[in-house]
Amino acid sequence: MDDLEQAIVISFETGAVDSALKSQAVTYCQQIKETPSICSICIEKLWFSKLVQVQFWCLQTLQDVLRVKYGSMSLDEQSYVRKSVFSMACLEVIDNENAGRVVEGPPFVKNKLAQVLATLIYYEYPLIWSSVFLDFMLHLCKGAVVIDMFCRVLNALDDELISLDYPRTPEEISVAARVKDAMRQQCVPQIARAWYDIVSMYKNSDPDLSATVLDCMRRFVSWIDIGLVANDAFVPLLFELILSDGLSEQVRGAAAGCVLAMVSKRMDPQSKLPLLQTLQISRVFGLVSGDVDSDLVSKVSALLTGYAVEVLECHKRLNSEDTKAVSMDLLNEVLPSVFYVMQKCEVDSTFSIVQFLLGYVSTLKGLPALKEKQLLHITQILEVIRIQICYDPMYRNNLNSLDKTGLEEEDRMSEFRKDLFVLLRTVGRVAPEVTQHFIRNSLANAVESSSESNVEEVEAALSLLYSFGESMTEEAMKTGSGCLSELIPMLLTTQFPGHSHRLVALVYLENITRYMKFIQENSQYIPNVLGAFLDDRGLHHQNFYVSRRAGYLFMRVVKLLKSKLVPFIDKILQNLQDTLSQLTTMNFASRELTGTEDGSHIFEAIGIIIGLEDVPAEKQSDYLSLLLTPLCQQIEAGLVQAKVASSEDFPVKIANIQFAIVAINALSKGFNERLVTASRPGIGLMFKQTLDVLLRVLIEFPKVEPLRSKVTSFIHRMVDTLGSAVFPYLPKALEQLLADSEPKEMVGFMVLLNQLICKFNSALHDILEEVYPVVAVRIFNVIPRDGLPSRPGAVTEEMRELIELQRMLYTFLHVIATHDLSSVFLTPKSRAYLDPMMQLVLNTSCNHKDITVRKACVQIFIKLIKDWCAEPYSEEKVPGFQNFVIEAFATNCCLYSVLDKSFNFSDANTHALFGEIITAQKVMYEKFGNTFLMHLMSKSFPSAHIPQDLAEQYCQKLQGNDIRSLKSYYQSLIENLRLQQNGSHVFR
């Protein structure tokens, strides 16, 4: 070995070679690459070196040089490289016994040689090296080595240039078109003939070579004349290969790949259909029943599915009755095998089962009636869906415990099933009776298997039923159309195997909930429904996830059945006694509880039932007491324990108090205001006593946010439930909620005040008179008069809280103003905050980026003007307010803010704001009369450079009664004024 060869070998070394030595070797190789004579060096090494590392390095270097420097190479150098690598590929060995043969090297070296030739073809064919393919074919008689090399060159050309499976540059696309056009004219027929001859000659003696040639041919079918391969010579040969048991699977599979390429070739459907007919594809149907893991079964499966797709496409695109009949016959012929492939075999990744089946089902939609064969196909499609949606048993334990693996598999299957369920519902619309019978039979088969090992089958059958229900109309569900009247009773009265598994239990309960419309109409099944939820299939299920989900679904069922459950109250409470006891005593801090699974829905469900007026008053009182008493006791005990709890135990005690409050809140949702205040005040008294207990939580732990928010939620609830009877509790409640409130807590506090104002209107005046000054001082201490930035961007969490507080303040002020409570702003305690409030509302009405907020502020001004300003020339109710409105609001908001280019008239929200601004101007004229008009004419309009005549026209419009005309004129005025300011328009 010379120095270069040694350096190349070291640079490829991956073992324990010194890193410094390897780096030195790589550097040396790179230096050699840069020498002007590098092509000669590489060619010489390729002829004489037998080291595969050296051969590969030289070929790679040649390819790099050609790609980067071809245009700058001399003609002699180009010719030298061309002749040399072509001679190597064609086995033209120089007369030297020490010469190496690159084409007899390992595959990676031969592939690299093929890539070098493909690169030369890229630059030189057909203008410089027009005979490359014809010259190469003259050497094919030398046997397998050259034939193999020829195929590798064609494959490299496909990979590097022609195939559209890879992204191509515009230049590459242009070169590919040039190469293909030249090959079609010059040599493709000869190449196709060579493929045929080689495969015919070597199919038995060298199956690997035959498979290589067939794979090469497959790549070219998409762009050569189809007649060169789809003819009386090639097609029989290919099917002979596919059907020959004595041949290797590799050859048979490669032949199937060629037929698939013919089938998939882009063609006019008028030409494609006869081709598909002549193939007589039924000859290979039996091959898919072999070993599903074999390469041949995989290739034939891909052929059949590809064939079916093309037949279906022809059926869609051809319009004549004859061609449609032919295509449907072909489709009917191949479909049973396609269904078999879908159910038993590994489907090719390029084939979309759902897309194909949806396409087929769509061809059946317009038919007046389905034939027997089509109905059979529908059943087979449903079986495909059932098999596809089955979980893999290997994940059974993971899915039951819902560990990380189980969660990932459930998420994956949930996504995977979406399209399959779309297909199911589509089939259900085309053939509802067949679909229902299939689901019934699937359920029956699942039930017959008493083995727990049938979990996946049972879950799949129940999932089919659940998904099918999504497309049913309410009327069909109520009446139990088709065999639904048989399916639902079967669902309710059957003990399904595998019910202990989480997946089966969940989908079973989801099904009952989905088909509740049927049960509402058939109340004889209510005991079965209750049994499913109350026994070990639901709330008493051994799996925590099931029992919690059952609580939520039970609540939904109760909401639908309501009064029909009154006769079963005792049974329900008796069955839930242990569950309720567990919920009120368990350590909730040790559980990760979220949303609908936190157990509170059981209390909501019970509240809905016992809150009905159909329940006798005495019993209702007993039931409520039975539930409220232990929950209140839990809160009282928790308060005592939390006071003395260690830092570790404190969160646990707080969590238990928190859940008890949530449960009480949920329980109260079943009781309405009329019941608890008018017809059964004793119930109202119990809720008042409960409210007393909960308010003590605020006294004991005012700064524990979870407790504070839950108590606030309960107060919200009691406002709706107790109505005005809640008034005596409000001062104490509001005082506690207001104490030491942070901005975030103030937001929640104002939400409560908004509810109270909307509920009680002016009746809340006295309470609001006391509360508003405290709210105002808190807020105006942290929010400046000109407001906070309205777009948070990259701001701190603290700033976000302040922005949210400011936003809620606008809502709060708007609610006060629009519920006839604006006098609250004028009380002695509140008067000090009037100016900062007005400045903030003014600034916001002009500048806030949120148009809806600006509109609310304009509406505040409108209401205050109406409330605080009498008719023209009367004494002012709020000294200085009129001047402030005319000079600040009318000018800055109603004129300047509208003139700003950001005020976009084409935006719907902005247009609504503009309407409010027009209303404000109209109200100002009604209240201030000529004083307002004079200010517009003498100050506002001149400052905006509005011509006198246009200003006068606007004032005339303002004094009229046509507000729509006023709005249109003012918009036109503003738009013209903007143009004038741009210097592109002058008023005349």
Swiss-Prot record:
Q: What happens when the gene is disrupted?
A: Delayed leaf formation during vegetative development, abnormal SAM layered structure, altered inflorescences, disrupted phyllotaxy, reduced number of seeds and reduced number of lateral roots.
Q: Name one GO cellular component term.
A: nucleus
**At the top level of its lineage, which domain of life is listed?**
Eukaryota
Tissue-wise, where is it found? Expressed in young leaves, growing leaf blades, young floral organs and root tips.
The answer to whether keyword Protein biosynthesis applies is no
Report the subcellular localization.
Nucleus; Cytoplasm
> Per the annotation, which location comes first and is thus the protein's main one?
nucleus
User: Which InterPro entries does the annotation name?
Assistant: ARM-like, ARM-type_fold, Exportin-1/Importin-b-like, Exportin-T_C, XPOT
**Known Pfam families for this protein?**
Exportin-T, Xpo1
Biological processes per GO annotation: flower development; meristem initiation; tRNA export from nucleus; tRNA processing; tRNA re-export from nucleus
Please name the GO terms that the record assigns under molecular function: nuclear export signal receptor activity; small GTPase binding; tRNA binding
Query: Mind listing the UniProt keywords for this protein, alphabetically?
Result: Cytoplasm, Nucleus, Receptor, RNA-binding, Transport, tRNA processing, tRNA-binding
Q: Which PANTHER family match?
A: EXPORTIN-T (PTHR15952:SF11), EXPORTIN-T/LOS1 (PTHR15952)
> Which family does the record assign?
Belongs to the exportin family.
Tell me, what does this protein do in biology? Probable tRNA nucleus export receptor which regulates tRNA processing and facilitates tRNA translocation across the nuclear pore complex. Is required for proper activity of the shoot apical meristem (SAM) and correct leaf initiation at different developmental stages, and may play a role in floral patterning.
Q: What is this protein called?
A: Exportin-T
The species this protein was found in: Arabidopsis thaliana (Mouse-ear cress)
Q: Which gene encodes it?
A: PSD
